[in-house]
């Protein structure tokens, strides 16, 4: 690799910054609360920065970060269980601006989708969030979740069917 090739490769920090919106969405889908999602993002980013040497340049940083975030979420959930705390779903309010009826309707639809996503079992919600929301390939999502591709596919099918039922659409 010559000097020009090295300079054209995005830095770890640059790639990480570009991933922040996607990481935040994934954290929200895992934690079901905006405040917990922020805490989860911060903890996962801290772990990633501390483990930066373990990431191999040229590999998918998004898959690596999703795995770190998921493992951090699992650790947090276990710690809360041990402390006899329970997760209380916080209303994930969305702000609606303007008087436009379509904007108001979009806000209502968004809340319905958020409510339906939060009602899914964790395994289905993770699969749906990674594949349908974040756009990961099935193979990459299966690697992040550390499950066989067939298991991912069945969780997606069940998750989609449950969402369609909850949202009143024909399966």
For each feature predicted by the language model, list its residue ranges.
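Acidic, proline/glycine-rich intrinsically disordered inter-domain spacer in sigma factors
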Residues: 10, 14, 91-118
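A short, charge-rich alpha-helical start-of-domain segment used by transcription regulators
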Residues: 2-25, 35-38
């Amino acid at each position: 690799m010559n000097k020009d090739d090295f300079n054209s490769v995005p830095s770890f920090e640059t790639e990480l910054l570009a991933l922040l919106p996607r990481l935040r969405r994934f954290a929200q889908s895992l934690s079901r609360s905006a405040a917990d999602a922020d805490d989860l993002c911060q903890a996962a980013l801290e772990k990633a920065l501390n483990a930066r040497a373990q990431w191999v340049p040229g590999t998918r940083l998004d898959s690596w970060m999703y795995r770190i975030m998921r493992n951090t979420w699992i650790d947090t959930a276990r710690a809360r269980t041990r402390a006899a705390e329970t997760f209380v779903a916080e209303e994930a309010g969305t702000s609606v601006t303007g008087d436009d009826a379509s904007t108001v309707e979009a806000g209502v639809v968004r809340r319905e989708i958020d409510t339906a996503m939060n009602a899914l079992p964790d395994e289905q919600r993770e699969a749906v969030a990674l594949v349908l929301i974040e756009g990961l390939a099935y193979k990459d999502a299966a690697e992040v979740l550390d499950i066989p591709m067939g298991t991912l596919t069945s969780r997606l099918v069940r998750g989609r069917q449950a969402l369609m039922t909850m949202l009143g659409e024909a399966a």
